[in-house]
């Protein structure tokens, strides 16, 4: 469990505390959690069976989709890691923490970073998944990112030394970016973003052709691409193209359709007035259920097709209405202050992202009371294929992910306290490398346990 930290009466995190006081307070927290202590990972004797943790999550999901989730997790240790955020959250809660909290992503593996367009149509790089976001220790996000880099590197066949270099570079980048952030103003931190020019400068020259290809692909992954891939023309109407079980229409007699329509109207009220005015120009033309991601498979998710009147053939947007379940961090970090998991996701995203989706909002199921958040399905979104990167490329890519994570933590935590705690040496970097190697072995064992559970018929998996 998280170790609480009692701060002095003159709270060094308050606006009254000086920069030096906050930095020294961060340094003092090394007595609570020595920096070298972050290297430790040993499963405790009462550690829950990871399959039980996954099955507990499955209880709240659509039963017919749960086998798809397990099928995707079976593919590799990395896909298992992506789908087992609840297992790693349970494990991280037993590890040392300094007591400094941030708005944590909660699932900061390397595939939850990527490129997307801001409302101003600039392409930026940032965290792009917030289903598990919650105020929590910064260590949990950094460790999940670095473990994922280790797992990917070993799957790519890189040596132990090259893998350690990849992970250490990410940990060092995180530390150095926070050190730099500690001398920035609040406004400078708020306005900072990682744009295309930053990415071009950070990556090695050998990777630039692939980066440009990825950027071009991201720009093409917009509403037009979503329409071409997911819809078809029936007479004069645009409709989603059924692709069961991944994309299916609801039965006209299903009351869920009425629920989705009511949720869209409720969602409308969560938008700022200017965005609501834009949204009101569109009308619903179709609704379907969609399977998304790995860890999210089985949560309720619909895509809603809207058409506007502004040009011949219609102007379309596709919104995703996705269930927001309890964060995997909540049992260990405490409940959200919002009291609504859809709002929790939206607030966390707005706090940590440099720029958020134009149509980001929330709603609630009228009959079930389930919480949802809403965003555009595709709006110039791109992700680099880490499984095709060589060691140098993965090293640089991991460092950009760590930069984005440090920027998010600096915005929502106290960068000066964090910088004071982390210090100017590689002590934390080396500890994170050691932890990542140890936990990657644990992840491989847990993945093997899932393979065995499927083989024994304990859980059902569907590979599509």
Task: Report each predicted region and the residues it spans.
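Positively charged, low-complexity intrinsically disordered regions
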Residues: 4-7, 345
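General secondary-structure propensity
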Residues: 7-17
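Conserved ATP-binding subdomain of kinase catalytic cores across diverse folds
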Residues: 15-18, 22-105, 110-213, 219, ...
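Long, low-complexity segments enriched in small/aliphatic residues
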Residues: 193-263
